[in-house]
Regions:
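Conserved class I S-adenosyl-L-methionine
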Residues: 50-77
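Conserved Class I S-adenosyl-L-methionine
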Residues: 82-166
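Short catalytic micro-motifs in class I SAM-dependent methyltransferases
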Residues: 26-30
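A short glycine-rich, Lys/Arg-flanked "PGG" loop and its adjoining helix->strand segment in the class I
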Residues: 35-50
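Conserved acidic residues
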Residues: 20
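Conserved SAM-binding strand-loop segment of SAM-dependent methyltransferases
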Residues: 1-15
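A conserved beta-strand element that flanks and buttresses the S-adenosyl-L-methionine
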Residues: 23
Length: 166
């Protein structure tokens, strides 16, 4: 049995040492002040508490970026590289000052996309400039992606989570 409540992790509305466990699922890279958030998380964890936070690394879904770049080199799917703010590579050094033990647990996974439409839908949903270059050439882009996915399009998943012990 457990309870949950959404709130900003930079100002956690609970007294000290209240929680056995805290989970942050792909959220720390959005924190404006990561140090403040980690201090708050540590503050509200019980002495034997554990903090789980998921992240991804630089290689996560890199094939999709290469795909759109091969179609048009001006396309950038995301101007922000969130994994540089908090990710697999820098997570230990960012979490280490706040926790006695930090461990990375890789989630072994990949994707094999065999249809163009789901991949195109994902690409068009990204936060970059892709719509500026794809929408006017949609039929051409769809044909390009269809050829790439015809034999299966492999996508690397470079993700997992950190377990952090107080």
């Amino acid at each position: 049995r457990f309870a949950f409540q959404p709130f900003g992790c930079q100002e956690i509305p609970f007294p000290d040492e209240q929680f056995d466990m805290i989970i942050a699922n792909h959220v720390l890279f959005y924190c404006e002040d990561l140090d403040k958030a980690l201090k708050e998380i540590k503050r509200v964890l019980k002495p034997e508490g554990i903090f789980f936070c998921s992240a991804y690394g630089a290689d996560h879904m890199e094939e999709i970026s290469r795909l759109v770049q091969d179609f048009d080199s001006r396309i950038i799917l995301s101007a922000d590289k969130l994994y540089e703010k908090f990710g697999r590579e820098n997570g230990p050094s960012l979490l280490g000052p706040y926790f006695s033990r930090v461990e990375w647990h890789r989630y072994e996974d990949s994707l094999l996309v065999t249809q163009a439409e789901p991949l195109i839908a994902y690409i068009l949903s990204c936060h970059g400039n892709q719509n500026q270059y794809i929408l006017d050439r949609y039929k051409e882009f769809r044909s390009f992606v269809s050829k790439k996915t015809a034999g299966g399009f492999y996508i690397t998943k470079d993700a997992g989570f950190f377990s952090c012990h107080k």
